[in-house]
Amino acid sequence: MRQSKFFMPTLKEAPSDAVAESHKLMIRGGYIRQVTAGVYAYLPLGYRVLRKAESIIEQEMDNINVPEMMMPHLLPATLWQESGRYQKYGAEMFKLKDRHGRESLLGPTHEETFTEIIAKNLKSYKQMPLALYQIQTKFRDENRPRFGLLRGREFVMLDGYSFAATREQLDQQFDDQKSAYKRIFKRAGVTVHPVIADSGTMGGKNSTEFQAPAAIGEDTIATNEKGTYAANLEMAKSIDTFKQEPEEAKELTKVATPACDTIKKLAEFLDVPATRIVKSILYIADDQKVLVLIRGDKQINEVKLGHVLDADDIHEANTEDLKEITGSEKGGVGPVNADWADKIIADETVKGLYNVVVGAGETDYQFKNANLDRDFKVDEFADIRTANEGEPDPVDHLPLKFTTSIEVGHIFKLGTYYTKTMGADFLDQNGKAQPVIMGSYGIGVTRMLSAVVEQHLTDRGVAWPKEIAPFEIHIVQMKMNKEDQTELAEKLEKKFSEKYDVLYDDRKERAGVKFADADLVGAPVRITIGKKAADGIVEVKRPTDEKAVEMSIDELDKFVNQELG
């Protein structure tokens, strides 16, 4: 490809609203251009990277015998209403009506559509296990699209779905997909951690995220140094090392605690450690009033709480509801005589506490010396707390380390979440109707590209991994009016183009402009044709090298083969 004919509008400076380094690089390098908030055009350079990433995915899906197909972008609302996700998905869904008033949506994901097709076309256990996938543009009406391709309203995604007759088949499909995803990310050059994750609105109870460590990441993952434990902070577990020595139960005493609206203020006012305080927070779970208890030095993890309550709508009670239900404002709520609560759930940190401080059910008042069972009851204990960095992990008891990261993939064991609702049944070996068992698998392809850039930035540009680099070799000719340089450049272009993607900079530009653009292209091998061309000597540089190295043509062949294979 001749650079003089290649559309690559580079910029010296990134737009002021670009925050993420990957966003800046992709704008400056002429990879993408914004059309509107959260929507981007992929220019030739960016589209080459995208297609190479898609090619890796296609190859790895072929390797596990998963065929590709294509679903429509425009979906009928009735399918999502049938699954129950039409309202649950919320404002992120692009909804529209046609001229006849029929409701439709732009697909943010395709579980319902695949399930409907399977329900109509898969009838026997003999047709399973089966898996399908597509690579397609998705649409989500993000409230705050930002960071370029990391959080957009339109993005390219691999979404795959598996269909099984037994749990054993699903487990094997899940493992096959997980292994394929690891290979995809490795080939794309992005470092990832597979972590325990929340399934969110996707449904199902078992899922794994693939998180790419990056400073701009919006997620936090908890890992140990051995790599034997990794979880999204939303689901991370840790060992609570605090132990209170047993005490004789003291008399329950009501005390005034004016203006103590935080645990810190309350602890200072009563001269007790936060571990002597039990926080009480009222949640509304569907129509149930649930009082949630946790030790004062810990924080409630609402994702974990959601799994315990298993309700469609869970939210903390507002000030008005709190006063009406409990008779107290926030801080005074407590578990003693809490007959108004439909259920009391406590974090495991509340076990083994003696003579603690709890809300007295009245604004600005607390009970001292409250004891479990004597003064209040708990219906259920569960791990509903947020893990803290440095706490021991639950596997090897090593300190947890927190890292910001980008979610680039997510795989789910959906089970029968969709198939039961949508009537996707098959006949088993005994001729009995059973719901198909599903899995769901996704990679944010355009998001993955941003993650690659974040992990492979250089001082001047980017160092693309060879399998997704827009060009593997970049030939840069210094003087276009020098015949010896042109002759050598064209010779190398012809030779290397037989095996590699080659960009030949044949522009009549200054050396500084050419080198600056080459840094933004980030080809694994840059070959500069300069004043020693007549002697068969070129300069070779990788994006991460400080300086170029002179080589003969014979040495160049060996170097290219070593770098690119």
Swiss-Prot record:
Any one GO CC term of the record: cytosol
Family: Belongs to the class-II aminoacyl-tRNA synthetase family. ProS type 1 subfamily.
Principal location: cytoplasm
GO molecular function, one term: ATP binding
Name of the protein in question: Proline--tRNA ligase
NCBIfam families for this protein: PRK09194.1, proS_fam_II
Quaternary structure and interacting proteins, as annotated: Homodimer.
Gene3D superfamilies xref list: Anticodon-binding domain, Bira Bifunctional Protein, Domain 2, YbaK/aminoacyl-tRNA synthetase-associated domain
Reaction catalysis annotation: tRNA(Pro) + L-proline + ATP = L-prolyl-tRNA(Pro) + AMP + diphosphate
Pfam families in the cross-refs: HGTP_anticodon, tRNA-synt_2b, tRNA_edit
Function: Catalyzes the attachment of proline to tRNA(Pro) in a two-step reaction: proline is first activated by ATP to form Pro-AMP and then transferred to the acceptor end of tRNA(Pro). As ProRS can inadvertently accommodate and process non-cognate amino acids such as alanine and cysteine, to avoid such errors it has two additional distinct editing activities against alanine. One activity is designated as 'pretransfer' editing and involves the tRNA(Pro)-independent hydrolysis of activated Ala-AMP.
Cited CDD domains: ProRS-INS, ProRS_anticodon_short, ProRS_core_prok
Sorted UniProt keywords: Aminoacyl-tRNA synthetase, ATP-binding, Cytoplasm, Ligase, Nucleotide-binding, Protein biosynthesis
Organism of provenance: Lactobacillus acidophilus (strain ATCC 700396 / NCK56 / N2 / NCFM)
InterPro entries for this protein: aa-tRNA-synt_IIb (IPR002314), aa-tRNA-synth_II (IPR006195), aa-tRNA-synth_II/BPL/LPL (IPR045864), Anticodon-bd (IPR004154), Anticodon-bd_dom_sf (IPR036621), Pro-tRNA-ligase_IIa (IPR002316), Pro-tRNA-synth_IIa_bac-type (IPR004500), Pro-tRNA-Synthase_IIa_type1 (IPR023717)
Locations listed in the record: Cytoplasm
Taxonomy of the source species: Bacteria, Bacillati, Bacillota, Bacilli, Lactobacillales
E.C. designation(s): 6.1.1.15
The UniProt record lists the keyword Mitochondrion: no
Coiled coil: none
Single Gene Ontology BP annotation: prolyl-tRNA aminoacylation
Domain notes: Consists of three domains: the N-terminal catalytic domain, the editing domain and the C-terminal anticodon-binding domain.
